[in-house]
Amino acid sequence: MNKLDIARIAQEFVLNSDYNYVSKENALTEELAGMKIFEEPIFAFGAADDEGFQLLKNPQAVGEHFLLPKEWMLSANTVISFFFPFTDEVIKSNRKDNYWPSDEWLHGRIEGQNFIKEFSIFLNSKIIDEGYESLAPTSDARFRLGCIRDNEINDFTSNWSERHVAYVCGLGTFGLSKGIITER
């Protein structure tokens, strides 16, 4: 399995997965039923032993609780990072109000996160089906998410940060709001 195979699998999932469309049952308004949430993703691939991952254990980055790729899976060689850009409909809708998020963006945040989880599980299974070892940290029983209460700012954190991993893999950089900025 190569990078083009992974991109093809992602493209098919984006187009055909019901998770990428707002269902009638979940739609906040009738007009949003059937709205597509994401476009095709962009990918970056990093070496599991990249020194950048070790730097994420620093308190100024993620923290000591961050698990390195080889702590998740000892045989890890490659880390796959991806970013799903919102559709124009989701992006443009959030320009309507400077205070409240749009309904479209709320669907992107909630149903969109569910889509990303399902995609991670799907891609992981495809890689395994091809005979490779694979693990999706956010779907692993060891994945932890929460607030660190023993620091001054009560940071919300996890032991695998997709946006920090994206940075190490070369997918993007950080903005002022700590979100990842990519080419798309």
What would you call each of these model-derived segments?
Residues M1-G108:
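Non-catalytic, usually N-terminal nucleic-acid engagement modules in DNA/RNA processing proteins
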Residues W100-R184:
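Catalytic cores of enzyme domains
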